[in-house]
Amino acid sequence: MPHNSDVRKNKLAKIQLDEDPRQTGIKISWQGEVKTFDSYKIPLQYLIYNKYNGRIGTLVSSHETQYSELDPENKNDANQIENFLWESKKDRNNATLSSIASEGQKLHGIVTIDGKIIDGNRRAMLLNKITSNPDKYPTTTHGHCEYFEAIILDSPGTEKELLKLETFYQMGQDEKLDYNPIEKYLKCKTLKQNDFSNNNISKLMNEKEPQILKWLETMEHMDSYL
């Protein structure tokens, strides 16, 4: 079961003090400037999923409308989020699962100071799937699959700052897996509701501004029918 926020925050701070980084000198744009970070190996139990991740945002929103709010700190709810992540790209997930099991995590993620995953939900889900089913994989994989390598942000950040970072790394750079149209519409709407301009949204999502306008109009039409 995932730990609470204070426990996670204390553990991540201790990791940065006591452990050697896996990578150094990683530059990311955070809070209006380019900052340099290191990445660390973090035990999976000290992380929680970002339930409104662009890849599964509509599934989570639909579930919460029909049933109840999902709490990533709750084991059953975390399992539901994992299921959404798995089903979102099942074929590709199977292929990546085999790769991670044999070779380990290749790309670092990004997490908040209390362990919320900003970039890397899917990779963390696959690592959790491997560690929760150890008999299916060679024992040589067990050690490296118990940890998620990630940058740990240096401050909590505002909701808007985290949304900006999340969007850039999930939808502006993530060419590994395409997002479905509805996820893009919803992300545009969320950014607009958080006072991002159309120009800012286009840059974050690596799309031309007329496309952003089209998606926002589509989302508005969809909302009018609900």
Protein language model annotation of sequence segments:
Residues P2-T139:
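Short, charged/polar connector segments at secondary-structure boundaries
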Residues F84-L85, S132, T141-S224:
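Amphipathic, charge-rich alpha-helical segments that serve as recognition/docking helices
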